[in-house]
Amino acid sequence: MIEDNINNNENENEDKNGNGNENENDKNNKNNKFEALLMQSPISQSTPFIFPSPKINSNILTTEPLTTQLSSSPTTTPSLKKRKPKTVRNPFIGPSSNKTKSNFPEFPSWTFEKNNNDFCQGGLSIKNKHLFTFDDNNNNNNNNNNNNNNNNNNNNNNNNNLNINFNNRSIYNNYKNNNNFNQSDDEDCEKDNDRFLNSENFDEEEDEEDEDDCTNKNFEWSIDMLATIMPVNITLDNQQNNLNSTNNSDNGYESSTELFEFKKWKIEDEKKSNDYFSRPTIYPHVKINNQNNQNNQNNSFLFKSSKTNQSIQQLQQQQQQQQQQQQQQNNNDNNNNNNNNNNNNNNSTLTSSNSLSGIKRKSSGSNYNSEDDTYSIEKDQTGVSAFVDDILIGDINLSSISSIGGGNSGIVFGRPTIFNTPTHFNTYIYNNNNNNNNNNNNNNNNNNNNNNNNNNNNNSGSNSKPIIAKRFPNRPQFPECLEESFSINLNKQSQNNNNNNNNNNNNNNNNNNNNNNNNNNNNNNNNNNNNNNNNIKIINNNNNDSDIFLTPMTPVKITSVTKSTRKSKYNFHVTDPLILPDISPIKIKHPITPTQINSNSSNNIVSPSSSPSKKFEYCKF
């Protein structure tokens, strides 16, 4: 019996050994199929893998974990085809053609729910779903669903570690989960037909042309929408004011006319906007008087306002009275030759023009009375009238001012440089008789005539009252810093009378001593020196420097004669080229200061031209 049992056991062992060999062959075949499937998958084609080697231990089949070289870059995703390069759509052109049915403008992607994948397809074609869900139940349901999905995925991972499934999806899931490839669905919204991806949440019927990356939707606002929010400021660079003819010829077009039209439009546009918002405009409005423009062809302009008209009449009356007084005194004391000399001297004085005219402005048509091409100036209006209030400006010479459009018919962009009428504050104008005295001394041979001429010239200089260009009529006419100079000027008549008596005595002595030639010449020279000292040489006829410029509204200290450091109380620069015109001080040639009075002889006043390099200061009130 024992032997029979041993034989039976041996037979059973042989059967088992035979069955074991058969099982090993079957398992080897299965392993070959496993490797073939992996080689066919896109994962094996793209990256080299280390395939697991199944081991048999106690009839339990186990596998080693998958390892790959891509474990350091978990963001890469496999695909069956090459993806088309993404085209970033311009966010300022509005939505694409298939999205016009939705509201405009598009909402950026950060406003969408991250877990709702339908927002990524087609912008706002969201199929009856809300952009912002404030319902707690919906949020909880979404979270629960996500948690359930995660739990299921973890269970599947554990099962895959224990049991090898030979389908492609389980292989990919095992590979993905073991290498931490957890890709969210909202990171990529493009169409993909890869069978190894979870593509249930993607719309496969969507056109590829309308595919957009959700990250590019952060600035999807139209340019029209932005234009309503952002202010638009049109500025003109000051460097564009260089209107050289060479530059214009190189460009091939008339850039000066374009610049003129632009500035003209800017002035009118800001005028309209300022009127609409009831703001004071910084641009003057000068009404053109067509009749005066036809009568005056010499480019003599005046700023016309209510008080300037009164000041014009007052100054003209003062000039007429002064001329009448001079003529009466000259007729009583002078001969015919002396009268001729006095007439010549009177003709040399500067007078303002009696006619008024407005600032001309370039017009598109011939009718200058149209409202579009004319302006009106008013009292207390900001702009130029604020600087020319209560002051006479006569014979403004615009010949040296560059105007755009050719000639003097255009708007003057720049500051005026020449004023023929002296408008310096408290400026005295006397007849400069130096040339006349020299001519009389050289031409006349009679000693008595020479003496009479000199005496008459002294009378004309002493009796002529100063013409004051009055800027502030309500303020004291004689400031403290000029009292001494005014007192000297007021005592000129008595001083000159004494000089006349001395001259007559000298003439009598010369006639009695029969030394007419020598002594009279000496006396003439002395008289000429007296005349030179009595006459303030504000206007130099030899050099034709008869241009005195305006002072600032408030006297300030100025060290440079070419530039003013005054700050305007209005919100604009004095040197703005768009102001018509800017009469800020450019150059003041002959100011009067007490420091220029000769301390030795109180009868004489040193001419300012004798010390041009000496600095001066304005008088403060």
Swiss-Prot record:
Region (Disordered): which ranges?
Answer: 1-29, 63-100, 135-194, 307-374, 430-471, 492-539, 594-614
List all Low complexity biased stretches: 1-10, 63-79, 137-182, 309-347, 431-459, 496-539, 597-613
**Record's compositionally biased regions (Polar residues):** 348-357
Output the superkingdom of the source species: Eukaryota
Annotated protein name in UniProt:
Putative uncharacterized protein DDB_G0286333
This chain's source organism reads Dictyostelium discoideum (Social amoeba)
